[in-house]
């Protein structure tokens, strides 16, 4: 390639790198819904509570809010153990409340970022319940498994919340992998069907 063209292409690439993206010029605010603002007096924060504080956040100059996980969950890890990706935790409100919150944010030019947990799910998720019943079933390969014996787990490091990263399931006589707690089995991203289910969300 001609030298001048190389220089021009390099300058164009550098200019593109220097162009500011939307996240470069605004202030984002993380909201842990459970403790942010309670609208109905039950002691638990909710979407209506967030809505009631949007004018305040706008006055502070907040341009984006990052909402911690709000999907249905048994809450072993503050909502980071999702049992239903298509349902809202009732403590926080309804799907209509969530949609209203998003609409009210849009009116104020506040971007909404949702913390969607895709590394793992809850051990109460229907996929995992199915995976633990049948080694040959559809959902078994949605997770990471290793064979072994009950008294001799595969080699592995410590889980984030302590203990081994491998947990024994007697029904299938295998160990499943969990980076965090035993209630949060890791999803197997090598499985195409599992990936497509997540993409469909």
Range-by-range predicted roles:
Residues 2, 8, 17-199:
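Acidic/aromatic-lined carbohydrate-recognition and catalytic surfaces
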């Amino acid at each position: 390639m001609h030298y001048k063209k190389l220089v021009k292409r390099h300058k164009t690439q550098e200019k593109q790198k220097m162009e500011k993206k939307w996240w470069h010029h605004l202030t984002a605010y993380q909201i842990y819904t459970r403790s942010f603002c309670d609208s109905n007096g039950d002691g638990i924060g909710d979407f209506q509570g967030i809505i009631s504080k949007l004018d305040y956040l706008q006055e502070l100059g907040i341009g984006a809010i990052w909402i911690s996980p709000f999907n249905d969950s048994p809450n072993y890890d503050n909502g980071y153990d999702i049992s239903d990706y298509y349902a809202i935790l009732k403590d926080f409100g309804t799907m209509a409340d969530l949609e209203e919150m998003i609409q009210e944010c849009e009116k104020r030019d506040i971007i909404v970022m949702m913390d969607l947990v895709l590394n793992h799910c809850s051990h109460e998720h229907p996929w995992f319940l199915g995976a633990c019943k049948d080694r040959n079933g559809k959902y078994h390969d949605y997770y990471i498994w290793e064979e072994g014996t009950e008294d001799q787990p595969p080699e592995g490091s410590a889980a984030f919340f302590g203990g081994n990263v491998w947990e024994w399931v007697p029904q299938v006589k295998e160990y499943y992998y969990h980076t965090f707690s035993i209630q949060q089995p890791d999803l197997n991203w090598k499985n195409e069907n599992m990936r497509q289910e997540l993409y469909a969300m």
